[in-house]
């Protein structure tokens, strides 16, 4: 890895770069953009690239990685590539085929990390969000411990170097950790995490179990109308973050990213803007003081931008518990 690429050691012995590039974009953004920005991100110094079946961009992201390998910029082992198992594939017999399909799209031999994208199982099939005639999402009931066993088999088969989860709460993590015959612990839990929703209790729990917390929406969110309330406050306009940005001569986004790194959180920086992609790698060039960190801690208001109200009645809805 690049020297500026600080990494964290995972509980299975592999290493994950602490700064990642998030590739999700709303459907109205042309897929070709994902190819372009992922190449830019690798050129800017990002080595950790985060995708998923849900994002419908694995072909483009895989092509970007392969083209940067082909032109000699990086080797495959320099890149840490993540994909995720979507909720319609939780039944154990569907897990490996889903990963193989993701690999085929990206044209890669393995992923560095494969995550269960969400604990909320949905009716199997090709539709990402299966609904009934009334437009209600159709749930599936799957024992996630059996899903996890299928994930472990993917690791044993060499299709995924590491395996983890996403959007799990403490109880859901404990269910996996306490599973009889557990072979591999999840290496991480990727969750929405930013100064307005800092997940400090979940972070402490994960640290106590040697599970890395990975932050998505670390810069707030791109306010996709399908999930995000347009009236929610804009994180990067927060006066405290803006004042700290001024103090350190950085952007509010860099303050929000640096905050996570200093609390031991791996952070995903999602941007489709070339200048901001280059800017975000400056996160290693400065430090926040203990006082700065306390000021940002004080912004927490348990605000999650991603409001999956249509899923709130799901038995595995992660926000039903305190953390």
Swiss-Prot record:
Could you say which residues are annotated as the site Involved in ligand recognition and product release? Answer: 227, 306
* Name of the protein in its database record: Aldo-keto reductase family 1 member C3
The organism of origin for this protein? Pongo abelii (Sumatran orangutan)
What EC number(s) is this enzyme filed under?
A: 1.1.1.-, 1.1.1.210, 1.1.1.53, 1.1.1.62
Q: Where is this site: Lowers pKa of active site Tyr?
A: 84
Q: Which UniProt keywords apply?
A: Cytoplasm, Lipid metabolism, NAD, NADP, Oxidoreductase
Q: Please name the pathway.
A: Steroid metabolism
Annotated substrate binding lies at 117
Task: Identify its protein family.
Answer: Belongs to the aldo/keto reductase family.
**One biological-process term from Gene Ontology?**
regulation of testosterone biosynthetic process
């Amino acid at each position: 890895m690049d020297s500026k690429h600080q990494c964290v050691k995972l509980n299975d012995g592999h290493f994950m770069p602490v700064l990642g590039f998030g590739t999700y974009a709303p459907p109205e953004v042309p897929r070709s953009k994902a190819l372009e920005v992922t190449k830019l991100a690798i050129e800017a110094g990002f080595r950790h690239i985060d995708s998923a079946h849900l994002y419908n961009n694995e072909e483009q992201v895989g092509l970007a990685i392969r083209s940067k390998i082909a032109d000699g910029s990086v080797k495959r082992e320099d890149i840490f590539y993540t994909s995720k198992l979507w909720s319609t594939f939780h039944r154990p017999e569907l897990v490996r085929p889903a990963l193989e399909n993701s690999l085929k799209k990206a044209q890669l031999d393995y992923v560095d990390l494969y995550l269960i994208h969400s604990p909320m199982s949905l009716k199997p099939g090709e539709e990402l969000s299966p609904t009934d005639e009334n437009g209600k999402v159709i749930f599936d009931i799957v024992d996630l411990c059996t899903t996890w066993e299928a994930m472990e088999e993917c690791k044993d088969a060499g299709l995924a170097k590491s395996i983890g989860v996403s959007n799990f709460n403490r109880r859901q993590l404990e269910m996996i950790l306490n599973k009889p015959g557990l072979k591999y612990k999840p290496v991480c839990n990727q969750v929405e995490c930013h100064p307005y929703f800092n997940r400090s209790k979940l972070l402490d729990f994960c640290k106590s179990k040697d599970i890395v917390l990975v932050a998505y929406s670390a810069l707030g969110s791109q306010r996709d109308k399908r999930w995000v309330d347009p009236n929610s406050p804009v994180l990067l306009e927060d006066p405290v973050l803006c004042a700290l940005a001024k103090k350190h001569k950085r952007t509010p986004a860099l303050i929000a990213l640096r905050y996570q790194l200093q609390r031991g959180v791996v952070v995903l920086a999602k941007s489709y803007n070339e200048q901001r992609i280059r800017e975000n790698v400056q996160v290693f060039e400065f430090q926040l003081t203990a006082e700065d960190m306390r000021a940002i801690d004080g912004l927490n208001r348990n605000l999650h931008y991603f409001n999956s109200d249509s899923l709130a009645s799901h038995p595995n809805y992660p926000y039903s518990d305190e953390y």
